[in-house]
Amino acid sequence: MNNFSQENNLNKKNLLKLLIEKSYKKGNFILASGKESAHYLNCKPVSLNGKGLQLISNLFLELMDPSSKAVAGLTLGADPLVSGVILTAASKGLLLDALIIRKETKEYGTKAGLEGPTLKEETVVTVLEDVVTTAGSAIKAIKKLRENNFIVKEVLSIVDRKEGGYEALKEHNIQLKSLFSIEDFLMNNVQN
């Protein structure tokens, strides 16, 4: 359990309400991991909402390892997250950079796999994710960052589905910190 400031404890409650309202569905779904699930979480309706992104960004910023100098994530789910966190950090006088990791390296121009400012080697970067199931997307992001000589210690996610992602990241010496787990949605007797 994460210990947040009093303000962010309220932010967390408000974020859960928004996620339940806009992001959570019951039914039969195939997830990005290929797994079948009776529960679907698409955080984009919340991360692409001004209030939702503000709540996520404040919580992530408080949760993030203070040694991190940048945030990064795999496009598309992480795009609003990295932007929101660096903007929130700047509003508090903290300077962070953001990197967006392409799913496929560009085949033209600079053939970049990462988009963003040029950072020094061994910069500590925190990976941001919306939902972690098996951590496949996060591991892809971590590998790309490590190939570029960055240090990754942690992944922050909005939701951990508790389907092996934590353990998979641990095998890569990465800590997973999540705002919520799937149990938070199940315990709230969501009727969607």
UniProtKB/Swiss-Prot annotation:
InterPro entries: OPRT, Or_phspho_trans_dom, PRibTrfase_dom, PRTase-like. 5-phospho-alpha-D-ribose 1-diphosphate binds at R102, K103, K106, E129, D130, V131, V132, T133, T134, A135, G136, S137. Gene3D superfamilies: 3.40.50.2020. GO terms for molecular function: magnesium ion binding; orotate phosphoribosyltransferase activity. Keywords: Glycosyltransferase, Magnesium, Pyrimidine biosynthesis, Transferase. Homodimer. Belongs to the purine/pyrimidine phosphoribosyltransferase family. PyrE subfamily. This is Orotate phosphoribosyltransferase. The lineage of its organism: Bacteria, Bacillati, Cyanobacteriota, Cyanophyceae, Synechococcales.
